[in-house]
Amino acid sequence: WLMIVEKECRVIVMLAKCYEAGKKKCQKYWPDSKDTLTFGQIKVFNAEEVRYSGFLVRKFQIESVEKMITMEVFQYQYTNWPDHSVPYTTSNLVRMHKNVIQLLAEIGGDAPMVV
């Protein structure tokens, strides 16, 4: 989260699930819906989770005590990638990509996207 705040990243794209075939593949680095986690001087509040066909969009409220800023960060998580394979169709992935591009156009700026 320190990197997110330092670079003012507004969008995170995640293509993996936390578990694949029962094995942990990714550390869950965000709080559950409507919960807050604190990472040093940074508080992360999961303000909203919206489920679409094939992906989730989470909206986080980030507060940096040290930098005295608050910011909104959006996380897109693709949830239809099958274990040890490739998606049967790309329609959900393409729809998520279009959502990300639209959001980037709306929020503007030149901050990097985290993938």
Curated annotation (Swiss-Prot):
Keyword Hydrolase in record: yes
Segments passing through the bilayer: none
Domain Tyrosine-protein phosphatase: 1-115
UniProt entry keywords in alphabetical sequence: Hydrolase, Protein phosphatase
Highest taxon listed in the record's lineage: Eukaryota
PANTHER family in alphabetical order: PROTEIN-TYROSINE-PHOSPHATASE (PTHR19134:SF562), RECEPTOR-TYPE TYROSINE-PROTEIN PHOSPHATASE (PTHR19134)
The protein's name in its UniProt record: Tyrosine-protein phosphatase 21
